[in-house]
Amino acid sequence: MPEPVKVLVTGAAGQIAYSLLYGIAKGDVFGKDQPLILVLLDITPMMTVLEGVVMELQDCALPLLKEVIATDKEDVAFKDLDVAILVGSMPRREGMERKDLLKANVKIFKSQGAALNKYSKKSVKVIVVGNPANTNCLTAMKSAPSIPKENFSCLTRLDHNRAKGQIALKLNVASDDVKNVIIWGNHSSTQYPDASHATVNLQGKDVGAFEAVKNDDWLKGEFITTVQQRGAAVIKARKLSSAMSAAKAICDHVRDIWFGTPDGQFVSMGVISDGNSYGIPEDLMYSFPLTIKNKTWKIVEGLPINDFSREKMDLTAKELHEEKETALEFLSCE
């Protein structure tokens, strides 16, 4: 059996983690023969709840799970990590300005970035889920200068999966028959879900999504807004934010980093924009279409971008730039 992989999940007493931990521990992410050490971090007031989560993990009697470490201390949590999944963040409270939310989260992710820098392996893969995910990821990256920038990514896979699901529902096909949708930009309502490079398998033949759907107005209108606003729609219906679907997306995201993407397919992740060929400013955590091989991602180059896409890609880049400026302001006065 290989050496155990050491995986941290923060916000471990929360509802996304509750759906996520079982998936990781039973081998959905790192494979069915990869032993694991799970490290669970949360804030001190949540430690009693976290004890209950640990009990349940023990009660699952999972063969791959070699050890569970629950802690409220960053120096314990970040020690010698292979993978860090940063789910915990300050949630937006009613009446809270986005700026206040950014400020609270800069503090958290600056501290966690510094802990990654100090205690984790330099090869650690860091996945940021807690919102605002792109800017939180940028903050952590900037606070961990000894870890390669490429090791940081943030979750837009939930949006990616939502986009696949909407096209599949529209055409009454399996979501697996829809490939190469793209989420560009920020994990916010300015994100751009782009179907113009997607294909759909109809009767055994791959057809462009626009040709398959035969409704350009829908793909350029309702499809985009549905994906952009899906998180809010789930909250409205369930009175809780997406947890099961978020956990599934995290599993997909991390599994693809670990094992790579299938040939001819790409996925969406927020990564550092340096050196991209799409005219997106450098030094932003921006969601691009990626292929992954040997645990290394590469932006898919050379996709033709029409005026409709250009405008939407630039709009979400502008929002990310503004978030970054605000975060850097807070970072420098922390």
Curated annotation (Swiss-Prot):
Keywords from UniProt, A to Z, are:
Cytoplasm, NAD, Oxidoreductase, Tricarboxylic acid cycle
Q: Does the keyword Cytoplasm apply?
A: yes
Query: What is the top EC class of this enzyme, as a single word?
Result: oxidoreductase
Q: Which GO terms describe its cellular component?
A: cytosol
A Gene Ontology molecular function term of the record: L-malate dehydrogenase (NAD+) activity
The entry's substrate-binding residues are R92, R98, N131, R162
Q: Under which EC number(s) is this enzyme classified?
A: 1.1.1.37
Ligand binding (NAD(+)): G11, A12, A13, G14, Q15, I16, A17, N105, Q112, V129, G130, N131
Q: Which reaction does it catalyse?
A: (S)-malate + NAD(+) = oxaloacetate + NADH + H(+); (S)-2-hydroxyglutarate + NAD(+) = 2-oxoglutarate + NADH + H(+)
One Pfam family it belongs to: Ldh_1_N
Catalytic residues (positions): H187 (proton acceptor)
Assign the protein's first listed, main location to one coarse class: cytoplasm
Any one biological process term the GO annotation gives:
tricarboxylic acid cycle
Q: Where in the cell is it found?
A: Cytoplasm, Cytosol
Q: How does it assemble?
A: Homodimer.
Q: Can you tell me which family this protein belongs to?
A: Belongs to the LDH/MDH superfamily. MDH type 2 family.
Function summary: Catalyzes the reduction of aromatic alpha-keto acids in the presence of NADH. Plays essential roles in the malate-aspartate shuttle and the tricarboxylic acid cycle, important in mitochondrial NADH supply for oxidative phosphorylation. Catalyzes the reduction of 2-oxoglutarate to 2-hydroxyglutarate, leading to elevated reactive oxygen species (ROS).
Which protein is depicted? Malate dehydrogenase, cytoplasmic
- Give the taxonomic lineage as stored in the record: Eukaryota, Metazoa, Chordata, Craniata, Vertebrata
